[in-house]
């Protein structure tokens, strides 16, 4: 496997050539054999095929990793030496190892050739007459359309050296190979947006990890959009770009799909050996400063559109921002006297430390049951487990750590969803709420930079309404523009906060407040709205 970096890398490793008179046993020899020949392996990199105003383009350069293998040939007087005929050497992370080769007069005047990745069968794949020893190998090299796996991608990136002579000085010998890439590379940068969220005064909200909305539903095809023409490039998450190895002089059109859009990338006359062509689609990466507010529209790629937008796009809208701020319990309630909420038991902080901006309410809504009646409450089971050090209980009532008048108002939906999952993993009890949650995720897929959808706690639902009737004035007025299902103020809503083995907390609304009640029998039918943190 290889890793690719935009920097020049030279790997210094020991190639185990022994001296005459050393052991000739066919054993694997470590790379630090005394007086061994030093092997310098340098990748010249894949550089841009565009004229550059920079003094240097280091391109995409290969770093070998443990387990990688190169093949070695030695040629003298127009013939390959039998003992160095496609000899494999394996990189162990710091040096190369293989069968020892004894140095003597036979190696005088020998030219060495190396290639990557090693192939066990090389018959007919070298040329002893022309200038390019590996010309047949490169000409017959086959690329697959499946390159999404890093290992599979690396094994298709053919690199070869030119003739390399053994250098001797004061009894020390070395070989220095420069490997050049024989394929060409397509690099695709799809649109992504870094959001800098601010408050009303324009002050940026604190965050440790940049919030970047990336393209979703990405797919690539060769020439035509058909199932048989689909290709899978390698995705570099750190650079947020796709890479596809292509044969030099290939002239396919690459068709990309993303965010319900399509782009066509014409590679004709752009695929050059050892060079890459970068395509930047719709401007690629950009930064946007956004005043985040309740009522903003939230989309499947993580993008956010102002709630003041007159005609927001309906496609890929998955919810409405319903609360702004850091929703982590250890942050929200850190100043509460005797607070039980700490960084240690904050599941949201632990699993999604970047979700510090707010909460989104789903467009999805449905009515149904919550779960079967249980012989033992989830809270009672939870208190007997080791999970008590990593989570807080789902109870809104039986909690010795906090005034039970306040507990139903806490933001604990993500914590509760995790505890419900742990309960299911233990007892395999089918909760209807999971089915609706999965349906929500299927209908309105959440971005990977979020928590994913969960049943909100009673406190999160209560917070939707206030004396200004924000549920209707700030949420429903936005919902109606992207959905035919507004928040029914007369409905009763499920929460993930538990009352006892038979009941969950349910939330109802008036024009001025939300109220959490304990009468939510788990087998009754009430309404669902799901939340996610971002």
UniProtKB/Swiss-Prot annotation:
Positions annotated as propeptide: 22-54
Signal peptide: 1-21
InterPro entries from the UniProt entry: Mfa-like_1, Mfa-like_1_N
Coarse class of the protein's main subcellular location: other
A cellular component annotation (GO) from this entry: pilus
Keyword Phosphoprotein found: no
Gene3D superfamilies, per the entry: 2.60.40.3570, Fimbrillin-like (2.60.40.2620)
A Pfam family matched in the record: Mfa_like_1
Residues where lipid is bound covalently (S-diacylglycerol cysteine): 22
Keywords: Cell outer membrane, Fimbrium, Lipoprotein, Membrane, Palmitate, Signal
Sites of N-palmitoyl cysteine lipidation: 22
CDD domains: BF2867_like_N (cd13120)
Record localization: Fimbrium; Cell outer membrane
Function comment: Probably a component of the fimbrium tip. Fimbriae are filamentous appendages on the cell surface that mediate cell adhesion and biofilm formation.
Family: Belongs to the bacteroidetes fimbrillin superfamily. Mfa-like family.
Complex formation: May be part of the fimbrial tip.
Protein name: Putative fimbrium tip subunit Fim1C
């Amino acid at each position: 496997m290889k890793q690719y970096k935009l920097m020049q890398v030279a790997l210094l490793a020991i190639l185990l050539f022994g001296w005459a008179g050393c052991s000739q046993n066919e054993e694997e020899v470590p790379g630090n054999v005394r007086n061994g020949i030093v092997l310098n392996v340098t990748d010249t990199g894949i550089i841009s095929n565009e004229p550059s105003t920079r003094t240097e383009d280091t391109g995409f350069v290969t770093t070998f990793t443990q387990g990688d293998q190169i093949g070695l040939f030695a040629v003298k007087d127009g013939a390959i030496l039998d003992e160095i005929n496609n000899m494999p050497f394996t990189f162990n992370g710091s040096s190369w190892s293989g069968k020892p080769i004894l140095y003597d007069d036979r190696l005088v005047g020998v030219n060495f050739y190396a290639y990557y990745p090693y192939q066990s069968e090389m018959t007919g794949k070298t040329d002893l007459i022309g200038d390019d020893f590996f010309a047949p190998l490169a000409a017959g090299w086959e690329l697959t359309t499946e390159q999404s796996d890093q290992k599979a991608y690396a094994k298709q990136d053919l690199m070869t050296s030119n003739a390399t002579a053994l250098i001797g000085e004061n009894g020390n010998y070395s070989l220095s190979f420069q490997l050049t890439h024989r394929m060409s590379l397509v690099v695709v940068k799809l649109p992504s947006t870094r959001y800098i969220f601010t408050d009303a005064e324009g002050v940026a909200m604190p965050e440790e990890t940049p919030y970047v909305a990336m393209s979703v539903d990405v797919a690539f095809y060769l020439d035509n959009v058909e199932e048989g023409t689909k290709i899978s490039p390698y995705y570099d998450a750190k650079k947020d770009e796709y890479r596809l190895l292509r044969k030099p002089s290939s002239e396919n059109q690459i068709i990309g799909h993303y965010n319900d859009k399509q782009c066509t990338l014409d590679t004709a006359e752009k695929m050059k050996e050892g060079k890459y062509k970068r395509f930047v689609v719709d401007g690629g990466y950009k930064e946007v400063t956004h005043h985040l507010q309740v009522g903003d529209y939230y989309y499947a790629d993580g993008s956010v559109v102002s709630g003041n937008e007159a005609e927001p796009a309906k496609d890929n809208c998955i919810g409405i921002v319903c609360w702004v701020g850091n929703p982590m319990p250890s942050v929200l309630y850190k100043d509460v006297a005797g607070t039980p909420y700490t960084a240690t038991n904050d599941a949201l902080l632990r699993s999604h430390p970047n979700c510090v901006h707010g909460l989104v309410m789903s467009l999805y809504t449905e009515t149904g049951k919550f779960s079967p009646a249980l012989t033992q409450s989830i809270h009672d089971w939870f208190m007997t487990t080791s999970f008590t050090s990593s989570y807080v209980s789902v109870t809104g009532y039986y909690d010795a750590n906090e005034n039970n008048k306040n507990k139903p108002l806490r933001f604990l939906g993500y914590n509760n969803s995790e505890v419900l999952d742990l309960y299911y993993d233990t007892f395999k009890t089918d909760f209807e709420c999971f089915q609706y949650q999965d349906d929500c995720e299927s209908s309105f897929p959440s971005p990977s930079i979020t928590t994913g959808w969960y049943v909100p706690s009673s406190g999160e639902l209560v917070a939707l309404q206030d004396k200004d009737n924000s549920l209707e004035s700030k949420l429903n007025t936005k919902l109606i523009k992207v959905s035919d299902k507004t928040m029914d103020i007369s409905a009763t809503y499920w929460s993930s906060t538990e009352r006892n083995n038979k009941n969950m907390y349910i939330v109802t609304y008036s024009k001025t407040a939300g109220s959490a009640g304990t009468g939510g029998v788990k087998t009754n039918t009430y309404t669902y709205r799901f939340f996610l943190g971002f």
